């Protein structure tokens, strides 16, 4: 029963090793391990072939030849797998997720309320392309808003004031690269889509 599990790993290009005497009492299992930030191995996914529970519960099926057969049960992690994956990613990136993974990809920072219509217009274009954003409409100083976005590890901050609205541009700051200067909405969108589609860190 180990051979099919190893074939699955091989087809998925997963480097494997046989853990002698590590199988569960009910049958062989496949554990997907990863190294955390401390270099320690943790299990992220488990798939197990259970050869005991079907008998214990009296489970049977009728095979194509009409005979009764005892099924094997496949255990797998489901919800725990997602939780462990999220924990791994949060730990690895320390909350500074790459753009493609960040829950909030863009933070718009209008300098004053009168710039909100322009920001909303640009935000609608980005939203149509699948970009996730928020607009910081708080009555706070711009420097404070930028600092907050940096502390929250938002990948991009978009600042819009009179000059940007008049020239149909945006002032762009990147968490990773700092001040990127002025861009049109089309230029910004091209950059974002390239970074997301290529899964850039």
Residue ranges and their predicted role:
Residues 15-18, 133-135:
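Generic structural signal for residues in well-ordered beta-strands
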Residues 93-145:
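Generic long, charged, amphipathic alpha-helical segments
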Residues 1-14:
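Single conserved hydrophobic/aromatic residue that forms the stacking wall/gate
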Residues 20-96:
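A translation/RNA-centric and nucleic-acid-associated enzymatic feature enriched
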Residues 10, 26-39, 115-117, 146-152:
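Short glycine/threonine-rich loop-to-helix capping motif typified by GTGT followed
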Residues 123-192:
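C-terminal structured "cap/appendage" subdomains that terminate the fold
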Residues 27-31, 56, 103, 153-155, ...:
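Broad gene-expression machinery/nucleic-acid interaction feature
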Residues 18-20, 29, 45, 144-148, ...:
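Short beta-alpha junctions and helix-cap segments that line functional grooves
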């Amino acid at each position: 029963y180990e051979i099919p599990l190893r074939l699955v790993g091989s087809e998925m290009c997963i480097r494997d090793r046989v853990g002698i005497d590590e199988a569960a009492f009910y049958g062989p299992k496949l554990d997907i391990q990863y190294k955390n930030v401390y270099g320690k191995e943790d299990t992220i996914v488990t798939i197990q072939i259970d050869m005991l529970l079907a008998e214990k519960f009296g489970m049977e099926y009728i095979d194509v030849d009409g005979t009764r057969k005892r099924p094997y049960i496949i255990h797998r992690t489901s919800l725990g797998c997602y939780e462990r994956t999220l924990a791994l990613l949060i730990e690895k990136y320390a909350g500074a997720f790459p753009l493609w993974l960040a829950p909030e990809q863009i933070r718009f920072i209008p300098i004053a309320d009168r710039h909100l219509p322009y920001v909303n217009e640009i935000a609608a274009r980005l939203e149509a392309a699948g970009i996730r954003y928020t607009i910081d409409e708080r009555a706070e100083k711009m420097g404070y808003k930028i600092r907050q976005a940096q502390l929250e590890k938002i990948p991009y901050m978009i600042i819009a004031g009179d000059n940007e609205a008049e020239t149909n541009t945006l002032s762009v700051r990147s968490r990773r690269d700092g001040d990127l200067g002025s861009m049109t909405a089309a230029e910004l969108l091209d950059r974002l889509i390239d970074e997301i589609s290529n899964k850039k860190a």
